[in-house]
A protein has these predicted regions:
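Acidic, low-complexity Ser/Thr/Gly/Pro-rich repeat segments typical of extracellular/periplasmic
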Residues: 22-137
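Short hydrophobic/aromatic patches on beta-strands that form ligand-binding or substrate-lining surfaces
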Residues: 142-145, 206-212, 318, 414-415
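Short, aromatic/His-centered strand-loop micro-motif at the edge of beta-sheets
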Residues: 256-317
Length: 434
């Protein structure tokens, strides 16, 4: 009789335990949404600061929520995104610690390390989504979109006021979503603002859209004029200009050398016919003959066609990066690498002694004028290579001379970063902005 009673109790307890387990719901995903829209069912662009809310069938164990159970990665460089994760019963709030990059693709992954309060593991889940806006990589410190009057910097901490805006008109930009562009007349148009040299850093990127107009862009003798597109202190800081025949384009730069004292002006000049191609030489005679071109590691070759079809009266995206850690500087046109130098390669006994110190470069910088009174200052200028009060370069470089190489055309979306962007970032930024 006792045996029967104990067996009955045992079966009852076992049955109760079995029934209890059957009532436990597995941890399944019900929905994942941003701003009330289910990402699982709708292709949507997510705002860069919007939290994502995941809802499950049963309560989540807060101790199972971690950087390995809930992950977000940026697709273009596979960078992990730091997340703020908050559990409330069956809901999980997933919020980036800092705003996501606009116009970028991300992947959200939830792994079996996530568990319910009963210890049941989640299966697995991954979903991709794209953020709103045009792709703009991190570390942007200044941006001019020319939508406001005066056309001030609208991003970052640089924030100067455009103190001189001379003969600037506005025109429709490169596409419907780009608003307006600044139009320069080729003789007097200019925008300038103070303290441009503050933007020159050991890690640096400048990117802008331009539409050069060569029609009627001639001097008083009928000769074609080149184009000073923008600048900080002419060749002594940073300036970009284009040859009148489109044989070359150039970023002149001021460079701070490794002793932290010496500052020199140097040209980063892309010859589109491949004139500097394959100039990393192995014998002493060639090294001595090629000078700065010994630093060339990549050079597109467009032959006699030059740059005309890429730059003349068409919208073109120009990007230049400088990277102290690799001693490299790179020019891109329309997201494609055109020209690259590695200045550390100048550290060679067969290279001219005058050029070897460039191998120690540490930063872009404004080379100060040693003459009194100074012939230029550190204003950032759009439409010319130096501020309009400057006297450097004589008549040919003077703003007041209508025969000088004033820029004629349109400018838009000028961006500056305190980081050297990668090839992928430059390409994505071009694709997003075109």
């Amino acid at each position: 009789m006792k045996i029967f009673l104990w067996l009955a109790v045992f079966l009852c307890l076992g049955s109760a335990h079995s029934c209890k387990k059957e009532n436990i719901q597995p941890l399944l995903l019900v929905s994942v949404e941003a701003s009330g829209v289910d990402l699982n069912n709708t292709a949507i662009r997510v705002a860069v600061s919007t939290p994502i809310k995941a809802t499950f069938t049963t309560s989540i164990d807060p101790l199972s929520v971690s950087a390995t159970s809930v992950l977000m990665t940026r697709d273009y460089d596979h960078a992990a995104v730091s997340l703020v994760l908050i559990v409330s019963g069956t809901q999980l709030s997933i919020k980036p610690a800092v705003n996501l990059v606009s116009g970028a693709v991300y992947t959200l992954t939830i792994t079996p390390e996530l568990k319910s309060t009963h210890g049941d593991p989640f299966g697995s889940f991954a979903i991709g989504f794209k953020t709103t806006g045009v792709f703009v990589p991190p570390n942007q410190v200044a941006y001019w979109n020319f939508e406001s009057t005066p056309p001030d910097d609208v991003v970052g901490t640089y924030d100067p006021t455009s103190t001189d805006v001379v003969d600037i008109a506005y025109a429709i930009s490169k596409n419907d979503s780009s608003g307006r562009a600044a139009s320069f007349n080729g003789t007097t148009s200019l925008i300038q603002m103070a303290n441009g040299s503050a933007l020159l850093k050991p890690e640096f990127t400048i990117s802008f859209w331009m539409k050069l107009n060569s029609v009627g862009h001639v001097d008083s003798n009928g000769n074609l004029k080149g184009s000073f597109v923008l600048g900080i202190g002419n060749t002594h800081g940073l300036q970009f200009d284009v040859d009148p025949n489109y044989a070359w384009c150039r970023f002149s730069q001021g460079l701070l050398l490794g002793d932290s004292i010496t500052k020199v002006a140097n040209d980063f000049q892309f010859f589109a016919n491949g004139a500097t191609k394959d100039n990393i030489q192995t014998n002493a005679d060639s090294l001595a003959a090629h000078g700065i071109d010994n630093a060339t590691v990549f050079n597109q070759d467009f032959g006699s066609a030059g740059l005309k079809q890429r730059l003349d009266n068409v919208w073109a995206n120009i990007t230049m990066t400088f990277e102290d850690s690799t001693k490299s500087r790179t020019l891109y046109i329309n997201g494609e690498k055109m020209y690259q130098q590695n200045l550390s390669l100048l550290d060679n006994p067969n290279v001219s002694p005058a050029l070897r110190p460039l191998a120690t470069v540490t930063s872009l910088v404004l080379v100060p004028d040693t003459e009194i009174p100074a012939r230029y200052d550190d204003k950032l200028v759009f439409g010319f290579w130096q501020n309009k009060e400057s006297t450097f370069g004589g008549a040919a470089g003077s703003y007041i001379n209508p025969d000088a190489n004033h820029f004629q055309g349109l400018l838009d979306d000028i961006r500056i970063f305190n980081r050297a962007l990668s090839d992928t970032e430059v390409s994505l930024m071009y694709e997003g902005g075109k």
